[in-house]
């Protein structure tokens, strides 16, 4: 959504998916394994998009300027290191005395699409286009699970007068789009310390302006104890980790 003329062009998406399939097949042959049956999807990645300064996954930018929050446990050593320079960006997590919120001031890149630029149906039509041109084109074969596809994970921002249309659209295209979450368009005003917060009051603008971060040199960070919890990693579950 930060570069829609390229990233949402159907021909670009199809050609890109073909390149992914060909690359996967070439690498699979080189390392002696079977190529993937499905090679493409779209998933939101908050941390990476935060570092790159882009919107997350298929989603438009929340606003031209907004506050992005991140929750960390109080016992995480990198939090204490961060607070040495940027205590002004942190606040206690409401309802959880063992967690802290970090507030990041975000400004969308020029030309980026925001959620205010799209209707809910317009957003879902974009999801459908990417699902067909990128995700389904990236399917090399469906020999084992016919009809199953990866998906474009998404959260749709819905205005009060759009719910019926959204319901109808999702039902009509239920065989093509899945992984849809729905959020009221003003959801950031309904939830305390929401992940994305528009600047709707003078106080919000003042807060945003005060959140200017001080650069942190994390090369100086040292973790004295290993707090890794293997059960919390994505590849682990049920008390064990998958080894391939």
Question: Where are the regions that the model predicts?
Answer:
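Conserved phosphate/anionic-ligand binding catalytic regions in large, soluble enzymes, centered on
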Residues: 1-2, 35-64, 240-243
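Internal maturation/activation junctions in enzymes
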Residues: 1-43
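N-terminal hydrophobic or amphipathic segments with adjacent small-residue motifs
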Residues: 26, 40, 51, 232-233
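Catalytic alpha/beta core of large soluble enzyme barrels
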Residues: 44, 51-230
């Amino acid at each position: 959504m930060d570069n829609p003329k390229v990233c949402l062009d159907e021909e670009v998406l199809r050609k890109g998916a073909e390149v992914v399939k060909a690359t996967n097949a070439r690498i699979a042959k080189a390392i002696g394994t079977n190529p993937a049956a499905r090679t493409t999807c779209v998933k939101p990645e908050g941390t990476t998009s935060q570092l790159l300064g882009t919107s997350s996954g298929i989603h438009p930018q929340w606003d031209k300027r907004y506050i992005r929050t991140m929750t960390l446990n109080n016992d995480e050593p990198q939090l204490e290191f961060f607070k040495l320079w940027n205590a002004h960006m942190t606040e206690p997590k409401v309802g959880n005395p063992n967690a802290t919120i970090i507030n990041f001031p975000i400004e969308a890149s020029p030309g980026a699409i925001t959620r205010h630029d799209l209707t809910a149906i317009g957003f879902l039509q974009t999801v459908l286009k990417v699902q067909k041109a990128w995700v389904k084109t990236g399917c090399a074969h469906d020999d084992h699970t016919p009809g199953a596809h990866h998906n474009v994970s998404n959260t749709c921002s819905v205005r009060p007068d759009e719910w019926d249309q959204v319901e109808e659209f999702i039902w009509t295209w239920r065989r093509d789009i899945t992984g849809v979450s729905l959020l009221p368009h003003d959801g950031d005003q309904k939830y305390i310390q929401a992940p994305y917060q528009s600047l709707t009051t003078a106080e919000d603008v003042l807060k945003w302006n005060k959140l200017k971060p001080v650069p942190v040199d994390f090369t100086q960070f040292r973790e004295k104890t290993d707090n890794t919890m293997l059960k919390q990693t994505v590849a682990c579950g049920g008390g064990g980790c998958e080894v391939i």
